[in-house]
């Protein structure tokens, strides 16, 4: 029987599995839809796909470095319990090693990389079927720059890498800890993206205009607030966590060093977690019971 695009589409919709996996399953059972679903359930593919809709906002940040290269990977799961599971962590080790070896920056490319004779994605699907939780290789970034690269992890939930020119490993590690604690978004105030500056400036202009101050004073207020804003979200403009009497920029100048770039990953940042409304759930159950 010919395996049509419509058949593959239907199987994808019913299992949530990948297109190639669906096509392969249909070919193996000569186009029998129900047999293909059963085959995929037995192999764990349908089971893994069914769990793919769950929010995976827990997990670990994996970090590997050598010389002036560092690679970070975020590996997510649904619960903190699985984040400590040996099988999950063993999978994570294989993923970070593969990402580091390939100097990977593309998570989709990482998913197609071979580990132990099969792709990262297939290994993930097998592990989902085994453990019973959704998990996801969410992102990867490799930093290769500067004279000195240091890394820091905080409880496996935050991972940081910093690349310096000048300075030494102690300074680089101190800056890693600072980045972990203070979450800068840019290296220097002048690096702040134009759209970020424009959005904040429009807000500050509205606030200044509502103050009733003369135009020239309002303009100075806006400029002062913008300097403060760009300083607060940039690494060199922030007070150094180990000595707030100086900024990171002043610390770097004193050490004769510069930050080339940095990476900061935190588990689950930007993932919308599902909020469980237990009160509404109980009310619905009570209402249903009273009708019965």
Swiss-Prot record:
Region (Involved in Mg(2+) ion dislocation from EF-Tu): 79-82
Subcellular location: Cytoplasm
Gene Ontology MF terms in the entry: translation elongation factor activity
Listed GO CC annotations: cytoplasm
Domain of life: Bacteria
Predominant cellular place of this UniProt entry's protein: cytoplasm
Keywords noted in UniProt: Cytoplasm, Elongation factor, Protein biosynthesis
Classification via SUPFAM superfamilies: Elongation factor Ts (EF-Ts), dimerisation domain, UBA-like
Similarity field: Belongs to the EF-Ts family.
Function statement: Associates with the EF-Tu.GDP complex and induces the exchange of GDP to GTP. It remains bound to the aminoacyl-tRNA.EF-Tu.GTP complex up to the GTP hydrolysis stage on the ribosome.
NCBIfam families, per the entry: tsf
Full protein name: Elongation factor Ts
Organism this protein belongs to: Idiomarina loihiensis (strain ATCC BAA-735 / DSM 15497 / L2-TR)
